[in-house]
Amino acid sequence: MSRFLICSFALVLLYPAGIDMYLVGLPRIAADLNASEAQLHIAFSVYLAGMAAAMLFAGKVADRSGRKPVAIPGAALFIIASVFCSLAETSALFLAGRFLQGLGAGCCYVVAFAILRDTLDDRRRAKVLSLLNGITCIIPVLAPVLGHLIMLKFPWQSLFWTMATMGIALLMLSLFILKETRPAAPTTSDKPRENSESLLNRFFLSRVVITTLSVSVILTFVNTSPVLLMEIMGFERGEYATIMALTAGVSMTVSFSTPFALGIFKPRTLMITSQVLFLAAGITLAVSPSHAVSLFGITLICAGFSVGFGVAMSQALGPFSLRAGVASSTLGIAQVCGSSLWIWLAAVVGIGAWNMLIGILIACSIVSLLLIMFVAPGRPVAAHEEIHHHA
């Protein structure tokens, strides 16, 4: 079982590492490519677009051909794209490389969740996804620090060679450690069950909405945090970095505690707690009389996301034993596109950073609480339905 956990964690972590590691080198990249930093900031959106594009096909391929045939090309593409970025001499070529990186990371991301659905039952999967969420929170803190240390001695291209090295390590894991977990092709008697695993069932769609809104909350916070903390609240750059590190610490602590909480409380209770924390955060930020109270509201955001997201993802994947790849892709596309659409629309309409965050917090909590309370889980995994544990 440990091989599947290690491989799944590695497959998922490629995605945030690809986002956060290069940011520290952005000024030098812009100077070398004769582009402005503003022009290259679109590299974040291009990377996410690549991920979304990969998710359009990766899930279906993973369900038909297996998890390894998607993970291996995904890791290989990430390696090639990282090298391509390091060799880019124009901003257009650099952005093309970032799109290809996103394609590779998206393939790996989809496979990771499909593997966890293949190998873990509902309760264990919720615990593992909560742990994974905590580990993922470390990357935005560690990746820029690692990038800074690398650039003390080496040029910005070394950041992408480091990413390529990470891709090589993942490729080796996928080739030699990861075992295929895709369930056997459905027999004639399994066809009714396969057909019953519809992406349009109410429970799955409710969890798609909940997880998409939750991701929108956390990405809105990340995107608006420089404005909120430095421009509005007046913190210096060093203080901003410290606050963001502390929020990551809150996320990690809550995420690592959630598996223990699942041994005491029902998953539904933790999901309700998550949304109540979001609602409390929105109200706190809306009426905050001081910076200290605002910072407390920010910690509620991190805690709310960490306590509920892994549980919601586990519930979303639960009904799909034969179509886990497609379900994982659907979740990923909805989360990437939905959160990006909200941030873009809010900016176009001219909603300020503070109101943008408060608005999504309150909307997410109200909609999600209604869905949690009124959309009951579908059928559990039947007793005869095998959970695939491989040696």
Swiss-Prot record:
Gene3D superfamilies in UniProt: Multidrug resistance protein D
Residue spans, topological domain Periplasmic: 25-41, 90-92, 152-157, 223-244, 290-292, 352-355
Protein name, as recorded: Multidrug resistance protein MdtL
Residue spans, topological domain Cytoplasmic: 1-3, 63-68, 114-130, 179-202, 266-268, 314-330, 377-391
Top-level taxonomy: Bacteria, Pseudomonadati, Pseudomonadota, Gammaproteobacteria, Enterobacterales
Main location: membrane
GO molecular function (one): transmembrane transporter activity
Signal peptide positions (record): none
GO biological process assignments: response to antibiotic
Transmembrane regions listed in the UniProt entry: 4-24, 42-62, 69-89, 93-113, 131-151, 158-178, 203-222, 245-265, 269-289, 293-313, 331-351, 356-376
Gene: mdtL
Key words of the record: Antibiotic resistance, Cell inner membrane, Cell membrane, Membrane, Transmembrane, Transmembrane helix, Transport
Localization per Swiss-Prot or TrEMBL: Cell inner membrane
